[in-house]
């Protein structure tokens, strides 16, 4: 239930902030894609208690590694991208939105 509520909050927040994105449900994850060219911006994998948000970029300087962001390029994972944040609460959602914005800005430029 917690992850489901977080998922809906995250989905709504992303779609409200970035109107040029569309949501697509895949078998193992959900994704947000550019309406213009179909490129992935981020994907979300839900577990029982948290969300795994994958930023759809391989650019090391775009999403800085931190306690909130880990490099998963050498770890098996669902989703598209090399950087992941675990979303466990509303504060994590707020922290992730600017990072999604960086990927979005990079993809549309």
Feature-to-residue mapping (PLM):
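Solvent-exposed, charged helical/coil patches
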Residues: 1-10
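Short, conserved beta-strand/beta-arch hydrophobic-aromatic motifs that form part
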Residues: 24-83
């Amino acid at each position: 239930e917690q992850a489901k509520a977080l998922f809906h909050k995250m989905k709504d927040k992303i779609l409200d902030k970035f109107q040029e994105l569309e949501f697509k449900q895949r078998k193992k994850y959900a994704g947000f894609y550019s309406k213009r060219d179909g490129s992935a911006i981020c994907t979300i994998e839900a577990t029982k208690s948290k969300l795994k948000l994958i930023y759809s970029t391989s650019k090391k300087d775009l999403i800085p590694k931190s306690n909130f962001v880990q490099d998963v390029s050498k770890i098996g994972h669902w989703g598209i991208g090399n950087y992941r944040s675990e979303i466990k609460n509303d504060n994590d959602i707020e922290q992730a939105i600017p990072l999604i914005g960086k990927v979005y800005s990079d993809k549309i430029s």
